[in-house]
Regions:
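Short S/T/G/P-rich N-terminal loop/turn motif that feeds into the first structured element of a domain
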Residues: 1-66, 80-81, 103-142
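Ligand-binding pocket scaffold of soluble enzyme catalytic domains
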Residues: 70
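An amphipathic, aromatic/His-enriched active-site/gating alpha helix that lines ligand/cofactor pockets
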Residues: 76-104
């Protein structure tokens, strides 16, 4: 499945701050892929209506058992409200047992830099995965 292109649920004001999250999920087996994909599409639909969502993209690599998300938000609170709301909250709880690994990275930018690029997101995810493997967290994370 190709990446779902950057979607802009709500217009972002010019020159405004934006809070970014990128994630990488790897499921245990190929048997877990269809379920994860279906659930991730439900979460994707939720993003398109979430208050404060400036943009999002999903990149599914089913044969590698890996899924990437990239999103930009008005602020950290808007992202957290989305993550705590249904269906996202229930989906994450339901899929927890299928996860082999996950990586999350957060950073701030401006709306002038949207849409975000996958190259930048993957670079930051790789750096965070290396920190996680070494037992450290990103500066300012948490």
């Amino acid at each position: 499945m190709p990446a779902l292109p950057w979607t802009r649920p709500h217009p972002a004001p010019a020159h405004a701050p934006a809070f970014v999250m990128a994630s990488r999920f790897e499921v245990h087996s190929l048997r877990d892929v269809p379920r994860f994909l279906l659930k991730s599409l439900a979460a994707w639909r939720q993003v398109t209506a979430a208050p404060g969502a400036y943009g999002a993209s999903l990149d599914a690599r089913p044969f590698k058992r890996t899924f990437y998300t990239l999103s930009a938000w008005r602020d950290r609170d808007a992202l957290h409200a989305y993550a705590r709301a249904e269906p996202h909250r229930g989906i994450m709880k339901d899929l927890r047992s299928t996860m082999r690994a996950s990586t999350f990275v957060f950073w701030e930018t401006t709306t002038d830099d949207l849409p975000l690029t996958w190259d930048e997101a993957r670079r930051r995810l790789a750096e965070q995965a290396a920190r996680d493997a070494a037992g450290g967290a990103a500066p300012g994370r948490g």
